[in-house]
């Protein structure tokens, strides 16, 4: 069913320009992500495969790239690429390239952040004169659950001359549940948000009128025709409850719905520890894996050729050294 949908986006005329077949089913910022869990841009093709290290059910660490599930994933991606449902510029795309193509209706399926980004995508489509209705897809049966990546964190570096001050005046008050957290979440009154009676985007199809005292985000100064969704802290991801949080009024329905769908259908990705062997070999190993994945998907080599090159170019050796170090 998923492939049939991609084929419809590819062979039909979803952008309504009167030309069949000048669009693609799915696009991504690479055939493999640049950060763990690596598979999130094309999960329907990876399915149960993991191109990197993971902890198995028996508690041991393994390199998923060496397993048959990864070979099957490569075959699925190569077949879809050959059929034309995967955007041929996927290898060189950045996330901004994908977003811009999505806003132009150049392809149909885009795996991206749940929550706030559902609103960002919708409003940018509408700003481009496109239909802003988006459908958040639950995972297909072969995927089972989406992977929730290990979250980014605020850090105080070892080079910091006053770490206590950074914690006291930044990190701690940013999560005070009060005025400072509100500032980091919603920004500055009159710049990012307001409670004044006013109409935004007057005379356009996105016109919105707010009553006096009604909290609302203001027009984004960097993206005309859209509203801010947050300042720094995503209100749906805050660690500390914010007193007098206007979230119900500020967070759009599509953001809440997509976040809930993801939360109901995800599992946490493994946090892979570092080892000396990981530091020594994983950079070159990852580069080799990425090169082989791209060559297979684009039809330059077969899956069997890729794994022969993985062996001859020390990939299997580096992989085993890292696995052994993780299982000590």
PLM regions: where:
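Helix-loop-helix "hinge/cap" segment bordering the ligand-binding cleft or interdomain interface
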Residues: 1-36, 53-97, 101, 156-168, ...
């Amino acid at each position: 069913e998923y492939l049939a949908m991609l084929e419809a986006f590819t062979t039909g005329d979803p952008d309504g320009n009167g030309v069949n077949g000048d669009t693609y089913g799915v696009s991504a910022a690479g055939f493999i992500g640049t950060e763990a869990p690596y598979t999130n841009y094309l999960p329907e093709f990876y399915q149960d495969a993991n191109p990197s290290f993971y902890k198995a059910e028996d508690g041991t660490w393994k390199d998923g790239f060496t397993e048959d599930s990864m070979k099957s994933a490569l075959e699925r991606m190569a077949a879809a690429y050959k059929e034309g449902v995967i955007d041929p510029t996927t290898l060189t795309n950045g996330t901004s390239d994908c977003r811009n193509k999505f806003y132009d209706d150049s392809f149909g399926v885009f795996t991206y952040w749940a929550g706030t980004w559902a609103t960002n995508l919708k409003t940018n489509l509408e700003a481009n004169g496109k239909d802003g209705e988006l459908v958040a897809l639950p995972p297909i049966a072969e995927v089972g659950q989406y992977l929730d990546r290990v979250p980014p964190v605020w850090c105080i570096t070892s080079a910091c001359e006053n770490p206590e001050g950074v914690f006291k005046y930044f990190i701690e008050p940013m999560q005070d549940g009060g005025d400072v957290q509100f500032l980091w979440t919603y920004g500055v009154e009159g710049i990012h948000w307001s409670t004044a009676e006013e109409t935004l985007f007057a005379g356009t199809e996105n016109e919105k009128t707010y009553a006096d005292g009604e909290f609302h985000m203001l027009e984004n100064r960097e993206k005309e025709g859209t509203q801010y969704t947050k300042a720094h802290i995503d209100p749906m991801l805050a660690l500390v409850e914010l007193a007098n949080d206007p979230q119900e009024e500020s967070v759009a329905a599509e953001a809440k719905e997509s976040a809930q769908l993801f939360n109901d259908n995800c599992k946490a990705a493994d946090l892979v520890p570092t080892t000396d062997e990981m530091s020594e070999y994983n950079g070159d190993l990852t580069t080799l894996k990425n090169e082989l994945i791209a060559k297979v998907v684009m039809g330059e080599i077969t899956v069997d050729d890729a794994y022969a090159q993985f062996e001859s170019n020390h990939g299997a050796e580096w992989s085993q050294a890292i696995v052994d170090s993780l299982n000590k």
